[in-house]
Regions:
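Short, surface-exposed beta-strand-loop junctions and turns on beta-sheet-rich folds
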Residues: 74-76
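Short, surface-exposed coil-to-beta transition loops
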Residues: 51-54, 69, 78-84, 101
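A short hydrophobic beta-strand element
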Residues: 62-72, 81, 87
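Flexible low-complexity loop/turn motifs enriched in small/helix-breaking residues
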Residues: 1-66
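Short beta-strand edge/turn micro-motifs at domain boundaries
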Residues: 83-101
Length: 101
């Protein structure tokens, strides 16, 4: 059986955008926040400056780790710009790594 292969590479994030996400995680995130609230809040940060439809899917969520995937949707190209976001709490400080898939 042949499986689909894809390339994963670490993706650069502009410092001001990274800071907005990390500020949100430090101030608002806890594992008891509803998935819908979390999706809406992070999607709103993500959508700043664009009118694209954003697909957002939470893959893992606990007190010190949040992993989700995003992609942009357009009627012409379907889903594009796929990213994997990994937030990890280390020594009371949130870290963010984003991968382009």
């Amino acid at each position: 059986m042949k499986t689909k292969q894809f390339n994963v590479s670490q993706s650069r994030i502009y410092p001001d955008i990274r800071d907005k996400y990390l500020d949100y995680m430090g101030e608002r995130y806890n594992m008891f926040i509803s998935d819908d609230t979390l999706k809406n809040d992070l999607r709103e940060i993500f959508r700043k400056g664009t009118n694209k439809t954003i697909h957002f899917n939470i893959l893992e969520k606990n007190s010190d780790l949040l992993v989700f995937e995003t992609s942009e949707y357009s009627k012409l190209l379907e889903f594009t710009n796929h990213y994997l976001w990994i937030f990890r709490l280390v020594n009371d400080k949130w870290n963010l790594i984003r991968y382009r898939v």
